[in-house]
């Protein structure tokens, strides 16, 4: 293994271990991190994060935060995190479709902002469940 990865929420250490690669949802798009990555601090967006270990890929829904990369260590401070095994697949799909519909029907700026936030959260959870079914 080449990266030490720690994912922390305000309540607890969510995931801590060795990884070959991670893919993060940042505020400017997805970012992959491999061994010997250049030091960086980045904002994390709401989305699905992928962690590759020797056992395969793990998908985690994160709800924004910050990431610090340096010296083959990755520290992620996230608002919330959910793993695929804690998400009900049918509920995630239903929430995603409902949030998508709300976003399409939003009229005012306030409604669009609120609907977009709900949509991004629902999409992250749904992507995590879909990634699990592909594994």
UniProtKB/Swiss-Prot annotation:
Coiled-coil residues: none
GO molecular-function term, one example from the UniProt record: proton-transporting ATP synthase activity, rotational mechanism
Membrane topology field: Peripheral membrane protein
One cellular-component annotation, GO: chloroplast thylakoid membrane
Keyword Plastid included in the entry's annotation: yes
Keyword annotations from UniProtKB, A to Z: ATP synthesis, CF(1), Chloroplast, Hydrogen ion transport, Ion transport, Membrane, Plastid, Thylakoid, Transport
InterPro entries registered for this protein in UniProt: ATP_synth_F1_dsu/esu, ATP_synth_F1_dsu/esu_N, ATP_synth_F1_esu_C, ATPsynth_dsu/esu_N
Principal location: plastid
Record has Transcription regulation as a keyword: no
Top-level taxon: Eukaryota
Localisation: Plastid, Chloroplast thylakoid membrane
Summary of the function given for this chain in its UniProt record: Produces ATP from ADP in the presence of a proton gradient across the membrane.
Assembly and binders: F-type ATPases have 2 components, CF(1) - the catalytic core - and CF(0) - the membrane proton channel. CF(1) has five subunits: alpha(3), beta(3), gamma(1), delta(1), epsilon(1). CF(0) has three main subunits: a, b and c.
PANTHER family in UniProt: ATP SYNTHASE DELTA/EPSILON CHAIN (PTHR13822), ATP SYNTHASE EPSILON CHAIN, CHLOROPLASTIC (PTHR13822:SF10)
Family designation: Belongs to the ATPase epsilon chain family.
The protein's name: ATP synthase epsilon chain, chloroplastic
Organism: Stigeoclonium helveticum
Gene that produces this protein: atpE
């Amino acid at each position: 293994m080449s990266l030490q990865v720690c994912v922390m929420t305000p309540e607890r250490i969510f995931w801590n271990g060795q990884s070959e690669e991670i893919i993060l949802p940042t505020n400017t798009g997805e970012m992959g991190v491999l061994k010997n990555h250049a030091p960086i601090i980045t904002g994390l967006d709401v989305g699905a994060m992928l962690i590759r270990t020797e056992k395969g890929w793990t998908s985690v829904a994160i709800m924004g935060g910050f990431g610090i990369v340096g010296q083959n260590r990755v520290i992620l401070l996230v608002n919330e995190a959910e793993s695929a095994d804690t998400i009900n697949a049918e509920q995630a799909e239903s929430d995603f479709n409902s949030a998508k519909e709300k976003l399409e029907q939003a009229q005012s700026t306030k409604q669009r902002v609120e609907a977009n936030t709900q949509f991004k959260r629902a999409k992250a959870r749904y992507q995590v469940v879909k990634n699990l079914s592909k594994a």
